[in-house]
Amino acid sequence: MSKELKAFVKARDEMLLKGSIDELRSFVEENRGLYDDNIVHDILDCSDKVAEITLHKMITAATNLPFEYRMNSVAWLTERGYGHYA
């Protein structure tokens, strides 16, 4: 894994561990050159509810995060009737 990718994954994981939609939006804004413009606009312009769902889905898919933390997001999504990646 390249240094750049390692740094990105580390920053992403730190953002996900904060569990904040404001942090998610800031992260996407700061890294907008790495994402398709449609994804950037979707995250920056969506409702807080959609951003929160997206955050939890990202947490479930981030295998570097602690298992229990990921499972908390699985439970959060399941309780609300949403799918997950774990």
Where are these regions (language model features)?
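Amphipathic alpha-helical binding modules
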Residues: 62-86
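A general marker of short, structured functional hotspots
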Residues: 4, 23, 31, 52, ...
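Acidic, low-complexity, intrinsically disordered interaction modules
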Residues: 31-67, 71
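TPR/TPR-like alpha-solenoid repeats
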Residues: 27, 34, 46, 79-80, ...
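Short terminal alpha-helical segments
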Residues: 1-32
